[in-house]
Amino acid sequence: MQCRSLENNDSIYQAHCKDCDTILGYRDPQTEGIRLQKPYLALSSQRDSTTRSHDAAHWFSCYLNQATETQGVRKFVFPTLPHEIWVFSTNLAYSSLECSEPKQAMKVLFKAREEGQDVETLRAGNLLIETLTLSPSLEELFYQVLQQENAKLPESLQSLMGWQVAVLPVLYSSGSTKA
């Protein structure tokens, strides 16, 4: 990992992979540490063993599950994107034509914020909304994942009460994925 600054070399702004130059994390001004972007990481228990990673949809469902548990809210806004999300259900079982076995998932609703509503206006009107702590590039990726998961649903299930619906797969355990 290599850390770089984008402005005046005064502080670390981003952490990059030395081999492929992928951005692995960014400086978090609140903690003064580096917040790793987990969808871009692969894990290995041994130095020479093969690495294992999960797709972005799994990482974001874990991220949302952690955020709902630690912050005690289910509605979130993106700091840099004009969208809000609502974690509607954290424990949903479903099956499909591709897999007849039930899979565990999380139902997430998302929509564009109403014109003129910035993050602070939304939070002032509703104390049960929190801001997601993602880098701008991860916010974009997260929103793309929500759109992709929405497109997988039958048309009749793609929206609910003015919100778009996404069903994100959930990891069962550290050793397997059933989604």
Task: Please give the residue ranges for each predicted region.
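N-terminal pre-domain and mature-chain start segments
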Residues: 1-179
